[in-house]
Amino acid sequence: MTTEIQLELEQAVNQRRNFAIISHPDAGKTTLTEKLLLYGGAIHQAGAVKARRDQRKATSDWMEMEKQRGISITSTVLQFDYKNIQINLLDTPGHQDFSEDTYRTLAAADNAVMLIDAAKGLEPQTRKLFEVCKLRALPIFTFVNKLDRPGREPLELLDEIEQELGLQIYAVNWPIGIGDRFKGVYDRRSKAIHLFERRAHGSQEAQETVIQLGDPKIEEYLEQDLYYQLKEDLEILEEIGADLDLEKVHSGQMTPIFFGSAMTNFGVKLFLEAFLDYALKPIGRNSSVGLVDPSYPEFSGFVFKLQANMDPKHRDRVAFVRVCTGKFEKDMTVNHARTGKTVRLSRPQKLFAQDRASIEEAYPGDVIGLNNPGVFAIGDTIYNGKKLEYEGIPCFSPELFSYLKNPNPSKFKQFQKGIQELTEEGAIQIMFSTDDFIRDPILAAVGQLQFEVVQFRMLSEYGVETRLEPLSYSLARWVAGGWKAIEEAGRIFNTMTVKDGWGRPVLLFKNEWNLQQVKEDHPKLELTSIAPVGSGIQPS
């Protein structure tokens, strides 16, 4: 029996790939996501990137505010099949104010796709998210986008990635021309040239002509200067580049690089097929009992995201669970590591942005949606068999703080419910004054847009108009020794002492100088910019 289960698990794991896309805003993430869905048959026509009135809304941007602004501000899950491989694409927020949501999503991913604008190269948000991938040793696949527009020289971009990120590089394909003269790519795997036909906004799969580099007919398709430039570039690549080493790719030391244009579909299919060959299958994860392999027959998984009101008609709450080991089955009863209780997992769902369908089973690498009536927290482990807990997902230091006020006392219950649910799902961090007379919660954010989203959702989902009252602090540090350490430190000048959502002490500082002064005055006070995890074991 055990052997049968393990064979079933092994087959399921071999047929799955799981990844998240990281990029700076406006690098074309939503467009690339939709083109991958187009090739996977999950959608039949790509949605409009800018959500113009006469075109479709982008498939992965489902929240009302996202549709209004044309930006992604939450992470979603998009599942599709391509050539008998099930792909779980963990779509991440496109706005830099929501990098913490992206971090949580990366905790559930086995691979990352780094999307770069060919004209701009590496940008600040991409660098930040790369550091998170590096910490987790995630394999990183690079897609250089927007080759159909004027951009930097490809060799210059390779050099920047290698020098600034410290990655070894391997160009899997190479662009032929840039901007208006972008004709297609040379695929180093098949040693063939793929020339693309331009279609309106790339709403259908790209049509292409495939010819060998030495084909005498090449002059019919390619201008002479582009042909000679390609040959020269390929010679340089052979001289300067290392061979593709999948061990180095899988450990995050080498990045395979692809060139193309998501808007026009140039190079997207070549990227997808190579990615499926090179990417890691679902992998083992660190836990309280060591590294747990996906083939372990007992079910386990962890919650990496909560989302309230995904369906406005039902006012539901969904927990996103990454399946880590074993086979998930509908209506199974599992252990909830944080509370020690047992939970029946009824009504599991397969997620596709705002669309959902009931599922009967799921395997390692899959993401399922579970109905969450206040049971789960981010980082929670659920399991069967021997007790285990996966690494939790920490919160990072916010930089903006503001009281959130409810001017209408008759909306008190709705206000409390909204704050609780939005905090649980990680839309924003919440803190409270240690002064019992101050009841207003303190919102703590990475960027201003998080405040706007909370106010928007409080009104649209809970019917509560709110008012912000900013605080003049810009840094938060958690106190390692808890309230006892605060007591022993005595009076701490020029700070505000608050408690976070788990009741732990946090010090707020006006600036870096203020923080350094407190460190000098209280050398025994251990401060950290990353919160201890509320659920799960502390990441190593």
From Swiss-Prot:
Residues 14-283 form the tr-type G domain. CDD domains: RF3, RF3_II. Keywords: Cytoplasm, GTP-binding, Nucleotide-binding, Protein biosynthesis. GO terms for molecular function: GTP binding; GTPase activity; translation release factor activity, codon nonspecific; translation release factor activity, codon specific. GO terms for biological process: regulation of translational termination. It is found in: Cytoplasm. It comes from the Bacteria. One of its GO terms (cellular component) is cytosol. Belongs to the TRAFAC class translation factor GTPase superfamily. Classic translation factor GTPase family. PrfC subfamily. HAMAP family: Rel_fac_3 (MF_00072). Increases the formation of ribosomal termination complexes and stimulates activities of RF-1 and RF-2. It binds guanine nucleotides and has strong preference for UGA stop codons. It may interact directly with the ribosome. The stimulation of RF-1 and RF-2 is significantly reduced by GTP and GDP, but not by GMP. This is Peptide chain release factor 3. It comes from Gloeothece citriformis (strain PCC 7424). The lineage of its organism: Bacteria, Bacillati, Cyanobacteriota, Cyanophyceae, Oscillatoriophycideae. The gene is prfC.
